[in-house]
């Protein structure tokens, strides 16, 4: 009889310890959260997905319970740190799902380490038209302070911008 075990731990990377939640059994599913969130962003779907996969939800460095990186990080830096963590955890190949900036990181993983990804699922992946990108980036930058952190919002604004997930459907899981 299989007993499902949930594990919360951290794994060392050259840039600091990366926190993760491991849940379920089966083929590895690496879950990458949106900017400014953490593993809790997956809390509404991880129970369902972990019935079919070994889910690894990571707090990217500088988020949640992970260490802050010691220097400025860009997307390729996050990908290298994540790959390092995955190799230590013996996740040599798996499915990757990313939400928002997590989707950008997942695409970087696919580009930098294609041998490590079986399937790639992108949720709310930011895509910009080159003609409108400068204006959109400038407007978006107004939401962040000089340290690159989101500016405080009212509760109503935060609630309106909150992340919500659809209820996982069996056909989605079968398609993975």
Language model region names:
Residues 1-17:
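N-terminal cap/lid segment of alpha/beta-hydrolase-fold proteins
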Residues 13-15, 56-97, 101:
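Active-site loop/oxyanion-hole signature of alpha/beta-hydrolase fold enzymes
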Residues 16-65:
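Conserved HGGG/HGGXW glycine-rich cap/lid loop of the alpha/beta-hydrolase fold
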Residues 28, 52-54, 92-95, 116-119:
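Structural signature of beta-strand start/N-cap positions in the alpha/beta core
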Residues 29-32, 56, 96-111, 122:
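A generic "structured core" feature
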Residues 41-43, 66-72, 131-134:
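Conserved catalytic-core motifs of eukaryotic protein kinase domains, centered on the activation segment
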Residues 107-112, 117-151:
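Flexible "cap/lid" loop of the alpha/beta hydrolase fold
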Residues 131-138, 147-176:
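Conserved alpha/beta-hydrolase catalytic His-Asp/Glu region
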